[in-house]
């Protein structure tokens, strides 16, 4: 009887321990599930940030390509502007040379005009003096007058050419100034684009480093989630085993309680028989 009680007590303790282990396993399971859920949420957040980083990286790469294209266009425009400036410089050189030649011709024409005017003045004075000279002298005077007219025409033509060359020179100088302004603007734009390109490149490097960091952290979280999943499975297995142990212990306890009840019934029956026997002996 004592052995049965002792065994029942031990079974009850085993049952309580099994229940405690099952509850602890359930607690561990819930804690692991909560932690896994938290890690999954954090992983999802990291994946979202990584996706945003990748989108920002794509945007930065697109900006970088655009900046490179703009820089190439600016360099091409600057090269075109430099070629245009060089062409204008050549044209200015040619115009200056033509202007120098025109000035030389003008100087010669003015000199001839001055000589012709002097000759005309002398001729005029001489004409008054020698009005009555021979026809030959009159012809010489006519020739000198013709030479004077030609000299005046040459001087007027030189003046017109000088004015035209000066006008062309002003136009070319204006075109040169505009070309230089465009070249300066293109150089300034190229410098701005180079600075923007440097900034974009630095941002790109920073984004690539962030992407690598997030990727490494994602791997760590995935490994930790795997570990927790394994622990969760182990906890579930232990909980299942504990539940089975509890069921088995409860079954054993029920069987022992039935046995105890049967023994009590037997003892009661024996006690009743003993009472009847003792009463019969007393009646004798």
Swiss-Prot record:
In terms of SUPFAM superfamilies, this protein maps to: Tropomyosin (SSF57997)
A Gene Ontology term for the protein's cellular component:
actin filament
Mind listing the UniProt keywords for this protein, alphabetically?
Answer: Coiled coil, Repeat
Region Disordered, residue ranges: 18-38
The record's listing under Pfam families reads: Tropomyosin (PF00261)
Q: Which GO terms describe its molecular function?
A: actin filament binding
Q: Give a brief account of the tissues where this protein occurs.
A: Predominantly expressed in body wall muscle and heart, low in intestine, ovary and larval tail muscle.
- What InterPro entries does UniProt report for this protein, alphabetically? Tropomyosin
Which GO biological process categories is it annotated with?
A: actin filament organization; muscle contraction
> Which chain positions lie within coiled-coil regions?
1-284
The task this protein performs is described as: The function of tropomyosin in smooth muscle and non-muscle cells is not clear.
Q: What is known of its domains?
A: The molecule is in a coiled coil structure that is formed by 2 polypeptide chains. The sequence exhibits a prominent seven-residues periodicity.
Family in the record: Belongs to the tropomyosin family.
Q: Which PANTHER family match?
A: TROPOMYOSIN (PTHR19269)
Record's subunit section: Homodimer.
**Protein name per UniProt:** Tropomyosin, smooth muscle/fibroblast CTM1
In the UniProt record, what gene is named as encoding this protein?
CTM1
């Amino acid at each position: 009887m004592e052995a049965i009680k002792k065994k029942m007590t031990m079974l009850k303790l085993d049952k309580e321990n099994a229940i405690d282990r099952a509850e602890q396993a359930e607690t561990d399971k819930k804690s692991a599930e909560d932690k896994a859920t938290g890690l999954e949420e954090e992983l999802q957040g990291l994946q979202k940030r990584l996706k945003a980083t990748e989108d920002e990286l794509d945007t930065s790469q697109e900006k970088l390509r655009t900046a490179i294209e703009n820089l190439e266009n600016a360099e091409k425009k600057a090269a075109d502007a430099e070629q245009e400036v060089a062409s204008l410089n050549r044209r200015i050189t040619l115009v200056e040379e033509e202007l120098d030649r025109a000035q030389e011709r003008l100087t010669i024409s003015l000199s001839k005009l001055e000589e012709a005017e002097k000759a005309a003045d002398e001729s005029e004075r001489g004409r008054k003096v020698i009005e009555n000279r021979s026809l030959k002298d009159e012809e010489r005077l006519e020739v000198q007058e013709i030479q004077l007219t030609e000299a005046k025409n040459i001087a007027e033509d030189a003046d017109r050419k000088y004015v035209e060359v000066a006008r062309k020179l002003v136009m070319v100088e204006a075109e040169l100034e505009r070309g230089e302004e465009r070249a300066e603007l293109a150089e300034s734009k190229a410098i701005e684009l180079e600075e923007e390109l440097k900034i974009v490149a630095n941002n790109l490097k920073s984004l690539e480093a962030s992407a690598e960091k997030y990727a490494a952290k994602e791997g760590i979280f995935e490994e930790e989630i795997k570990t927790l999943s394994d622990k969760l499975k182990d906890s579930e297995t232990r909980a299942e085993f504990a539940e089975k142990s509890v069921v088995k212990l409860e079954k054993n306890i029920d069987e022992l309680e039935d046995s105890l009840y049967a023994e009590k019934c037997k003892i009661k029956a024996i006690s009743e028989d003993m009472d009847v026997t003792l009463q019969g002996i007393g009646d004798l």
